[in-house]
Amino acid sequence: MAKKLRKRERKFRFKRPQWHIYLLLLPMVLLSVLPILYIVSTAFKPTGELFAYPPKFFTLRPTLDNFRKLFEASEDTVFPLSMYLFNSIVSTVAVVLIGMIISLVAAYALSKKRFRGRKLIFKMNTLSMMFVATAVSIPRYLIIKEVGLIDSFWANIIPMLAMPVGVFLLKQFVDQLPDEVIEAARIDGANDYQIVWKIVTPLVKPALATVAILLFQNAWNGMEASKMFINTESLKTFAFYMNTLSNSGNGVAGVGISAAASLLMFLPNVVLFILMQSKVMNTMAHSGMK
């Protein structure tokens, strides 16, 4: 027992050279954490501290008044908050499930199937990762209009399904699967769908978890569809609703309401990442992305 304790102590004891690494990483960690702490602190600040001088980073008298004002503002709207929340939950679940399937099938085809133009398609997929959503908003609107999805609930789902980074991550994992395993499954009579479902999927779960998180963040926080593609209020999402409420506040009170709305939108992302943190780290270690 004593030997085990000594081994455990040696395992977690910092060596002197490691302190240099932690000193370099500490500023980066602080820069990443400070915005989160600021949102949390501002959401719980009373009105008198929001623009106090000198400003205080942390509140000394935390309160739930900003959240109360946020929900009071939601009661004055025509449609209830629950309707927007339902729209977001349905569209987010659909985007995550369908997007994972599309990304996995595309990654398998680009990795293990041999067809003309395969390398060109993957290069185009990689190139598309360079463009932000704003750069393609007009072409996306024109496509949505041509296929007749304007002012449709599907406009919340279909534009979110294309995820080049998801295909890229999954392809790196599928590339590592031995071709002999795939060939053995084909000899046993398995078709491509059975290979993807029964062989590939269990072996790329870390990458799938990472893709699920990215899809969730895009769908849950996305407001593009509600702003550009949808005119009917009953089809809009929770993110758009929270953004509208936070912008409706005036002056000091509006800052507190905005921080409370931002915190409510941010919490599901944090919870999901914490639950899948180990799989995300595994994905980054094996995908070539650092």
Positions of predicted regions on the chain:
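A hydrophobic, multi-pass inner-membrane permease signature
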Residues: 2-290
